[in-house]
């Protein structure tokens, strides 16, 4: 019964749908396998997670359990997160050269909608779920306001160069309102659809498929922004990060950049 109330509680929160689903699955899994939410069972569950999953996954599960403990007024039983070892380089980030190459190929081959998908992701720093929220009206306005997980408003800016070219494309297509990126059935395209299509383009144009996925372009936005305007506090705001510490990862080199520097510098 408490879990059903918890579901209703989450439904009224500002959490993403996938997060709510994940929280409910975790709490149900615990209840079925461990029963009562007491200290002994909670520590046993944490031990199971640590033994079988990566730290990031462990912390996601613990976050769900802690949210439920908060809900049933048992905050004192909250579990501590496990430490995640931070890598000293960024992995699988598309290079600026490959991003420009992909854009040029898509434009040349008349794949205009996908040309704009890639450009919007990289010029706005949008998460793919946020990209899907963009409407014609937002392009005309130059920005989109969204509510973040913490209930704050985050503004996603659409740069002038992108905005001007996108408006021309919209007018040529005769689109006057509604979501910008649609599938062949006239429905809003899905995150999975975008990811699959990007993999297809990577294969088609001879790019490393590990580098061509939606979030890679968000990483490229952050790297390019700091290269041109070194204000990490502003970047944190633009990306919707709760903490500036999350944004600091973009001060690091990518693995390929590190390799290039080592190859150039180390000659002994």
Where do the PLM segments sit?
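Conserved catalytic core of the tyrosine transesterase superfamily
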Residues: 1-268
